[in-house]
Swiss-Prot record:
Gene: PSY1
Metabolic or biological pathway, per its Swiss-Prot or TrEMBL entry: Carotenoid biosynthesis; phytoene biosynthesis; all-trans-phytoene from geranylgeranyl diphosphate: step 1/1
Group of enzyme by EC: transferase
Keywords: Carotenoid biosynthesis, Chloroplast, Isoprene biosynthesis, Plastid, Transferase, Transit peptide
Predominant location category: plastid
Protein name as it appears in the record: Phytoene synthase 1, chloroplastic
Protein backbone atom coordinates (compact mmCIF):
# COMPACT_ATOMS: atom_id res chain seq x y z
CA UNK A 1 0.00 0.00 0.00
CA UNK A 2 1.60 3.23 -1.09
CA UNK A 3 1.51 6.01 1.45
CA UNK A 4 1.51 9.74 0.90
CA UNK A 5 5.14 10.36 1.77
CA UNK A 6 4.84 14.10 1.97
CA UNK A 7 1.98 16.49 1.68
CA UNK A 8 4.06 18.17 -1.00
CA UNK A 9 4.69 15.08 -3.13
CA UNK A 10 2.91 14.93 -6.45
CA UNK A 11 1.50 11.73 -7.97
CA UNK A 12 3.32 9.58 -10.49
CA UNK A 13 6.77 10.90 -9.52
CA UNK A 14 8.16 7.67 -8.09
CA UNK A 15 10.63 5.98 -10.38
CA UNK A 16 10.04 2.39 -11.41
CA UNK A 17 13.76 1.73 -11.39
CA UNK A 18 16.00 0.43 -8.63
CA UNK A 19 14.33 0.40 -5.23
CA UNK A 20 15.22 3.31 -3.00
CA UNK A 21 15.98 0.98 -0.12
CA UNK A 22 18.42 -0.94 -2.32
CA UNK A 23 20.65 2.09 -1.91
CA UNK A 24 19.92 3.27 1.62
CA UNK A 25 18.79 0.28 3.67
CA UNK A 26 22.20 -0.06 5.32
CA UNK A 27 22.53 3.66 5.90
CA UNK A 28 26.09 3.88 4.59
CA UNK A 29 25.31 3.72 0.87
CA UNK A 30 23.27 6.38 -0.80
CA UNK A 31 23.04 5.27 -4.41
CA UNK A 32 24.30 2.15 -6.12
CA UNK A 33 28.01 1.65 -5.62
CA UNK A 34 28.87 2.06 -9.29
CA UNK A 35 27.83 5.72 -9.07
CA UNK A 36 28.83 6.74 -5.54
CA UNK A 37 31.14 4.01 -4.32
CA UNK A 38 33.12 5.64 -1.54
CA UNK A 39 31.41 8.93 -0.78
CA UNK A 40 30.06 8.05 2.62
CA UNK A 41 31.85 6.93 5.73
CA UNK A 42 30.79 3.77 7.54
CA UNK A 43 31.49 5.46 10.85
CA UNK A 44 28.71 6.31 13.23
CA UNK A 45 28.11 10.06 13.45
CA UNK A 46 28.16 11.56 16.92
CA UNK A 47 27.17 15.17 17.33
CA UNK A 48 26.40 17.06 20.48
CA UNK A 49 23.87 19.75 21.02
CA UNK A 50 20.81 17.70 20.16
CA UNK A 51 17.61 18.59 21.91
CA UNK A 52 15.73 16.35 24.29
CA UNK A 53 12.39 15.06 23.10
CA UNK A 54 9.37 15.31 25.34
CA UNK A 55 11.52 14.83 28.43
CA UNK A 56 12.23 11.27 27.37
CA UNK A 57 8.56 10.34 27.60
CA UNK A 58 7.06 8.46 24.71
CA UNK A 59 3.53 9.22 23.62
CA UNK A 60 1.43 7.85 20.81
CA UNK A 61 -2.06 8.47 19.62
CA UNK A 62 -2.81 4.87 20.49
CA UNK A 63 -1.79 5.42 24.10
CA UNK A 64 -4.28 8.29 24.37
CA UNK A 65 -7.26 6.02 23.79
CA UNK A 66 -9.62 6.01 26.73
CA UNK A 67 -11.65 2.86 27.24
CA UNK A 68 -14.73 1.91 29.20
CA UNK A 69 -14.74 -1.17 31.45
CA UNK A 70 -16.22 -3.09 28.52
CA UNK A 71 -13.22 -2.14 26.41
CA UNK A 72 -15.02 0.31 24.12
CA UNK A 73 -13.27 3.52 23.12
CA UNK A 74 -14.63 6.82 24.41
CA UNK A 75 -12.72 8.98 21.92
CA UNK A 76 -12.91 8.97 18.15
CA UNK A 77 -9.75 8.81 16.05
CA UNK A 78 -10.24 12.43 15.03
CA UNK A 79 -10.38 13.52 18.67
CA UNK A 80 -7.19 11.62 19.47
CA UNK A 81 -5.34 13.02 16.47
CA UNK A 82 -6.46 16.56 17.30
CA UNK A 83 -4.60 16.27 20.60
CA UNK A 84 -1.40 15.74 18.63
CA UNK A 85 -2.26 18.69 16.37
CA UNK A 86 -2.59 20.97 19.40
CA UNK A 87 0.81 19.89 20.71
CA UNK A 88 2.52 20.58 17.38
CA UNK A 89 0.81 23.96 17.05
CA UNK A 90 1.87 24.93 20.57
CA UNK A 91 5.49 24.15 19.71
CA UNK A 92 5.41 26.46 16.69
CA UNK A 93 3.58 29.22 18.57
CA UNK A 94 6.31 29.27 21.22
CA UNK A 95 8.86 30.01 18.52
CA UNK A 96 6.66 32.64 16.87
CA UNK A 97 6.36 34.48 20.18
CA UNK A 98 10.14 34.73 20.43
CA UNK A 99 11.06 35.48 16.82
CA UNK A 100 9.76 35.22 13.30
CA UNK A 101 13.26 34.77 11.94
CA UNK A 102 14.86 31.42 11.16
CA UNK A 103 18.18 30.98 12.93
CA UNK A 104 20.41 29.10 10.50
CA UNK A 105 23.31 27.28 12.07
CA UNK A 106 26.58 26.75 10.20
CA UNK A 107 27.37 23.42 8.58
CA UNK A 108 28.70 20.87 11.03
CA UNK A 109 31.61 18.68 9.87
CA UNK A 110 30.78 14.98 9.67
CA UNK A 111 33.48 12.39 10.42
CA UNK A 112 34.75 10.41 7.46
CA UNK A 113 35.33 11.32 3.86
CA UNK A 114 32.00 13.11 3.29
CA UNK A 115 33.29 16.32 4.82
CA UNK A 116 30.37 18.66 5.38
CA UNK A 117 26.77 18.39 6.45
CA UNK A 118 25.83 20.37 3.35
CA UNK A 119 26.89 17.39 1.25
CA UNK A 120 24.53 15.16 3.21
CA UNK A 121 21.70 17.55 2.37
CA UNK A 122 22.76 17.49 -1.27
CA UNK A 123 22.42 13.69 -1.27
CA UNK A 124 18.91 14.07 0.13
CA UNK A 125 18.18 16.50 -2.69
CA UNK A 126 19.41 13.99 -5.26
CA UNK A 127 16.99 11.40 -3.89
CA UNK A 128 14.11 13.87 -4.15
CA UNK A 129 15.12 14.78 -7.70
CA UNK A 130 15.16 11.11 -8.71
CA UNK A 131 12.04 9.85 -6.94
CA UNK A 132 9.80 12.94 -6.68
CA UNK A 133 10.44 15.15 -9.69
CA UNK A 134 7.50 17.52 -9.39
CA UNK A 135 8.01 17.87 -5.64
CA UNK A 136 11.69 18.65 -6.15
CA UNK A 137 10.82 21.28 -8.74
CA UNK A 138 8.47 22.95 -6.27
CA UNK A 139 11.12 23.10 -3.57
CA UNK A 140 13.34 25.22 -5.82
CA UNK A 141 11.13 28.21 -4.94
CA UNK A 142 11.71 27.73 -1.21
CA UNK A 143 14.54 29.32 0.76
CA UNK A 144 17.68 27.14 0.81
CA UNK A 145 17.25 26.36 4.52
CA UNK A 146 13.64 25.25 4.15
CA UNK A 147 14.38 23.34 0.95
CA UNK A 148 17.15 21.30 2.55
CA UNK A 149 15.03 20.56 5.60
CA UNK A 150 12.13 19.31 3.46
CA UNK A 151 14.54 17.08 1.56
CA UNK A 152 15.76 15.54 4.81
CA UNK A 153 12.21 14.84 6.02
CA UNK A 154 11.27 13.39 2.63
CA UNK A 155 14.16 10.95 2.76
CA UNK A 156 13.32 9.78 6.29
CA UNK A 157 9.66 9.25 5.36
CA UNK A 158 10.64 7.33 2.26
CA UNK A 159 13.03 5.08 4.14
CA UNK A 160 10.34 4.41 6.73
CA UNK A 161 7.73 3.57 4.09
CA UNK A 162 10.12 1.24 2.28
CA UNK A 163 10.51 -0.84 5.44
CA UNK A 164 7.02 -2.29 4.98
CA UNK A 165 6.35 -1.51 1.32
CA UNK A 166 9.70 -2.22 -0.30
CA UNK A 167 11.35 -5.36 -1.70
CA UNK A 168 12.48 -6.49 1.75
CA UNK A 169 9.11 -5.92 3.41
CA UNK A 170 8.54 -9.65 4.00
CA UNK A 171 11.56 -9.69 6.31
CA UNK A 172 10.49 -6.72 8.43
CA UNK A 173 9.30 -7.58 11.95
CA UNK A 174 7.87 -5.49 14.79
CA UNK A 175 11.29 -5.72 16.44
CA UNK A 176 12.88 -4.13 13.36
CA UNK A 177 10.44 -1.23 13.61
CA UNK A 178 11.27 -0.90 17.31
CA UNK A 179 14.94 -0.57 16.37
CA UNK A 180 14.05 2.03 13.74
CA UNK A 181 12.16 4.02 16.39
CA UNK A 182 15.13 3.82 18.77
CA UNK A 183 17.30 5.15 15.98
CA UNK A 184 14.80 8.00 15.53
CA UNK A 185 15.20 8.87 19.21
CA UNK A 186 18.95 9.12 18.64
CA UNK A 187 18.42 11.42 15.67
CA UNK A 188 16.34 13.82 17.76
CA UNK A 189 18.91 13.72 20.55
CA UNK A 190 21.77 14.69 18.24
CA UNK A 191 23.22 11.21 17.75
CA UNK A 192 22.60 10.37 14.06
CA UNK A 193 23.73 6.97 12.83
CA UNK A 194 24.56 7.86 9.24
CA UNK A 195 24.67 10.75 6.81
CA UNK A 196 20.95 10.66 6.05
CA UNK A 197 20.14 10.70 9.75
CA UNK A 198 22.64 13.53 10.10
CA UNK A 199 20.68 15.75 7.73
CA UNK A 200 17.45 15.09 9.64
CA UNK A 201 19.14 15.62 13.00
CA UNK A 202 20.37 19.01 11.85
CA UNK A 203 16.90 19.85 10.53
CA UNK A 204 15.11 19.12 13.80
CA UNK A 205 17.69 21.19 15.68
CA UNK A 206 17.00 24.20 13.45
CA UNK A 207 13.20 24.04 13.20
CA UNK A 208 10.47 23.50 15.84
CA UNK A 209 9.82 19.94 14.67
CA UNK A 210 8.45 17.54 17.27
CA UNK A 211 9.24 13.84 17.33
CA UNK A 212 5.64 12.70 17.83
CA UNK A 213 4.51 12.64 14.16
CA UNK A 214 7.63 10.61 13.31
CA UNK A 215 6.81 8.08 16.02
CA UNK A 216 3.24 7.92 14.81
CA UNK A 217 4.34 7.20 11.25
CA UNK A 218 6.31 4.23 12.54
CA UNK A 219 3.16 3.15 14.39
CA UNK A 220 1.41 3.20 11.02
CA UNK A 221 4.02 0.80 9.68
CA UNK A 222 3.33 -1.49 12.65
CA UNK A 223 -0.36 -1.32 11.83
CA UNK A 224 0.38 -2.42 8.27
CA UNK A 225 2.18 -5.49 9.61
CA UNK A 226 -0.70 -6.66 11.77
CA UNK A 227 -3.81 -5.35 10.04
CA UNK A 228 -5.27 -5.81 6.55
CA UNK A 229 -8.91 -4.80 7.19
CA UNK A 230 -10.59 -1.73 8.70
CA UNK A 231 -13.99 -2.08 10.34
CA UNK A 232 -15.12 1.48 9.77
CA UNK A 233 -13.90 4.89 8.70
CA UNK A 234 -12.83 5.76 12.23
CA UNK A 235 -10.23 2.99 12.06
CA UNK A 236 -9.23 3.95 8.53
CA UNK A 237 -8.88 7.61 9.51
CA UNK A 238 -6.41 6.67 12.23
CA UNK A 239 -4.38 4.64 9.74
CA UNK A 240 -4.40 7.52 7.26
CA UNK A 241 -3.21 9.87 9.99
CA UNK A 242 -0.37 7.54 10.92
CA UNK A 243 1.01 7.05 7.43
CA UNK A 244 0.19 10.39 5.77
CA UNK A 245 -1.40 12.96 8.06
CA UNK A 246 1.76 12.86 10.14
CA UNK A 247 3.72 14.19 7.19
CA UNK A 248 1.66 17.35 7.17
CA UNK A 249 2.45 17.89 10.84
CA UNK A 250 6.16 17.34 10.18
CA UNK A 251 6.13 19.81 7.30
CA UNK A 252 4.34 22.87 8.71
CA UNK A 253 7.30 24.04 10.84
CA UNK A 254 9.53 23.79 7.76
CA UNK A 255 7.09 25.40 5.34
CA UNK A 256 6.44 28.23 7.76
CA UNK A 257 3.32 30.32 8.29
CA UNK A 258 3.20 33.70 6.55
CA UNK A 259 3.94 36.55 9.00
CA UNK A 260 0.88 38.43 7.71
CA UNK A 261 -1.44 35.45 8.20
CA UNK A 262 -4.33 35.99 10.61
CA UNK A 263 -5.22 32.31 10.77
CA UNK A 264 -4.70 30.35 13.96
CA UNK A 265 -1.72 28.03 14.05
CA UNK A 266 -4.09 25.17 14.85
CA UNK A 267 -6.12 25.82 11.70
CA UNK A 268 -3.00 25.65 9.53
CA UNK A 269 -1.99 22.37 11.15
CA UNK A 270 -5.51 21.03 10.63
CA UNK A 271 -5.27 21.90 6.94
CA UNK A 272 -1.93 20.10 6.68
CA UNK A 273 -3.44 17.08 8.40
CA UNK A 274 -6.45 17.19 6.05
CA UNK A 275 -4.22 17.20 2.97
CA UNK A 276 -2.33 14.17 4.25
CA UNK A 277 -5.61 12.35 4.88
CA UNK A 278 -6.94 13.37 1.45
CA UNK A 279 -3.80 12.18 -0.32
CA UNK A 280 -3.87 8.83 1.46
CA UNK A 281 -7.57 8.28 0.78
CA UNK A 282 -6.79 9.01 -2.87
CA UNK A 283 -3.95 6.47 -2.80
CA UNK A 284 -6.33 3.90 -1.35
CA UNK A 285 -9.00 4.50 -4.00
CA UNK A 286 -6.42 4.45 -6.79
CA UNK A 287 -4.77 1.22 -5.58
CA UNK A 288 -7.80 -0.96 -4.77
CA UNK A 289 -6.88 -3.62 -7.33
CA UNK A 290 -3.19 -3.62 -6.48
CA UNK A 291 -3.91 -3.96 -2.76
CA UNK A 292 -6.49 -6.70 -3.37
CA UNK A 293 -3.87 -8.77 -5.18
CA UNK A 294 -1.86 -8.58 -1.96
CA UNK A 295 -4.86 -9.70 0.08
CA UNK A 296 -5.44 -6.25 1.56
CA UNK A 297 -8.60 -4.13 1.63
CA UNK A 298 -8.18 -0.52 2.80
CA UNK A 299 -11.89 0.29 2.65
CA UNK A 300 -14.37 0.58 5.55
CA UNK A 301 -15.92 -2.85 6.00
CA UNK A 302 -19.20 -1.49 7.36
CA UNK A 303 -19.64 0.82 4.37
CA UNK A 304 -18.92 -2.02 1.96
CA UNK A 305 -21.61 -4.09 3.67
CA UNK A 306 -24.09 -1.21 3.52
CA UNK A 307 -23.46 -1.00 -0.23
CA UNK A 308 -24.13 -4.72 -0.62
CA UNK A 309 -20.44 -5.46 -1.29
CA UNK A 310 -17.88 -7.75 0.31
CA UNK A 311 -14.19 -8.54 0.08
CA UNK A 312 -15.04 -11.27 -2.42
CA UNK A 313 -16.49 -8.66 -4.78
CA UNK A 314 -13.26 -6.68 -4.57
CA UNK A 315 -11.11 -9.75 -5.17
CA UNK A 316 -13.30 -10.60 -8.19
CA UNK A 317 -12.62 -7.13 -9.57
CA UNK A 318 -15.96 -6.51 -11.21
CA UNK A 319 -17.22 -2.97 -11.77
CA UNK A 320 -20.93 -3.08 -10.96
CA UNK A 321 -23.55 -0.44 -10.27
CA UNK A 322 -23.14 -1.15 -6.56
CA UNK A 323 -19.41 -0.53 -6.87
CA UNK A 324 -19.93 2.73 -8.76
CA UNK A 325 -22.32 4.03 -6.10
CA UNK A 326 -19.89 3.01 -3.35
CA UNK A 327 -16.94 4.67 -5.11
CA UNK A 328 -18.84 7.91 -5.68
CA UNK A 329 -19.32 8.22 -1.91
CA UNK A 330 -15.66 7.45 -1.19
CA UNK A 331 -14.48 10.00 -3.75
CA UNK A 332 -16.86 12.60 -2.32
CA UNK A 333 -15.33 12.08 1.13
CA UNK A 334 -11.78 12.46 -0.18
CA UNK A 335 -12.73 15.70 -1.93
CA UNK A 336 -14.13 17.05 1.32
CA UNK A 337 -10.70 16.59 2.90
CA UNK A 338 -9.07 18.37 -0.05
CA UNK A 339 -11.53 21.24 0.43
CA UNK A 340 -10.55 21.44 4.10
CA UNK A 341 -6.87 21.44 3.16
CA UNK A 342 -7.30 24.40 0.82
CA UNK A 343 -8.19 26.61 3.76
CA UNK A 344 -4.66 26.46 5.14
CA UNK A 345 -2.38 26.42 2.11
CA UNK A 346 -2.75 30.15 1.48
CA UNK A 347 -1.63 30.83 5.05
CA UNK A 348 1.81 29.29 4.48
CA UNK A 349 4.87 31.40 3.78
CA UNK A 350 4.87 32.64 0.19
CA UNK A 351 7.89 30.59 -0.92
CA UNK A 352 6.35 27.36 0.38
CA UNK A 353 2.88 27.56 -1.15
CA UNK A 354 3.58 26.33 -4.67
CA UNK A 355 4.76 22.77 -3.89
CA UNK A 356 1.80 22.31 -1.56
CA UNK A 357 -0.69 23.66 -4.08
CA UNK A 358 0.87 21.44 -6.74
CA UNK A 359 0.38 18.39 -4.54
CA UNK A 360 -3.21 19.30 -3.79
CA UNK A 361 -4.21 20.08 -7.37
CA UNK A 362 -2.51 17.05 -8.92
CA UNK A 363 -3.57 14.52 -6.32
CA UNK A 364 -7.17 15.70 -6.49
CA UNK A 365 -7.07 15.10 -10.25
CA UNK A 366 -6.43 11.40 -9.61
CA UNK A 367 -10.00 11.24 -8.33
CA UNK A 368 -11.15 12.72 -11.65
CA UNK A 369 -9.22 10.00 -13.46
CA UNK A 370 -10.86 7.25 -11.40
CA UNK A 371 -14.21 8.64 -12.51
CA UNK A 372 -13.00 8.84 -16.12
CA UNK A 373 -12.08 5.14 -15.89
CA UNK A 374 -15.71 4.37 -14.96
CA UNK A 375 -14.56 3.53 -11.41
CA UNK A 376 -12.45 0.62 -12.63
CA UNK A 377 -9.65 0.80 -10.09
CA UNK A 378 -9.24 -2.98 -10.21
CA UNK A 379 -7.32 -3.25 -13.48
CA UNK A 380 -6.74 0.42 -14.39
CA UNK A 381 -4.42 2.61 -12.35
CA UNK A 382 -5.55 6.23 -12.45
CA UNK A 383 -2.79 8.74 -13.10
CA UNK A 384 -2.39 12.33 -14.21
CA UNK A 385 -0.85 12.55 -17.68
CA UNK A 386 2.05 14.87 -18.44
CA UNK A 387 -0.17 17.06 -20.58
CA UNK A 388 -2.67 17.47 -17.76
CA UNK A 389 0.18 18.23 -15.35
CA UNK A 390 1.41 20.97 -17.67
CA UNK A 391 -2.05 22.50 -17.56
CA UNK A 392 -2.50 22.05 -13.79
CA UNK A 393 0.87 23.32 -12.56
CA UNK A 394 0.40 26.92 -13.77
CA UNK A 395 -2.96 26.90 -12.01
CA UNK A 396 -1.25 25.74 -8.82
CA UNK A 397 1.38 28.45 -9.22
CA UNK A 398 -1.28 31.12 -9.67
CA UNK A 399 -3.01 29.93 -6.50
CA UNK A 400 0.31 30.12 -4.65
CA UNK A 401 0.52 33.85 -5.40
CA UNK A 402 -2.70 34.58 -3.52
CA UNK A 403 -1.75 36.16 -0.14
CA UNK A 404 -3.25 35.11 3.20
CA UNK A 405 -6.68 36.35 4.14
CA UNK A 406 -6.75 39.77 5.77
CA UNK A 407 -9.26 38.87 8.44
CA UNK A 408 -9.78 35.91 10.72
CA UNK A 409 -11.78 35.22 13.83
CA UNK A 410 -8.73 34.15 15.83
CA UNK A 411 -5.15 35.37 15.97
CA UNK A 412 -2.12 33.12 16.04
Amino acid sequence: MSVALLWVVSPCDVSNGTSFMESVREGNRFFDSSRHRNLVSNERINRGGGKQTNNGRKFSVRSAILATPSGERTMTSEQMVYDVVLRQAALVKRQLRSTNELEVKPDIPIPGNLGLLSEAYDRCGEVCAEYAKTFNLGTMLMTPERRRAIWAIYVWCRRTDELVDGPNASYITPAALDRWENRLEDVFNGRPFDMLDGALSDTVSNFPVDIQPFRDMIEGMRMDLRKSRYKNFDELYLYCYYVAGTVGLMSVPIMGIAPESKATTESVYNAALALGIANQLTNILRDVGEDARRGRVYLPQDELAQAGLSDEDIFAGRVTDKWRIFMKKQIHRARKFFDEAEKGVTELSSASRFPVWASLVLYRKILDEIEANDYNNFTKRAYVSKSKKLIALPIAYAKSLVPPTKTASLQR
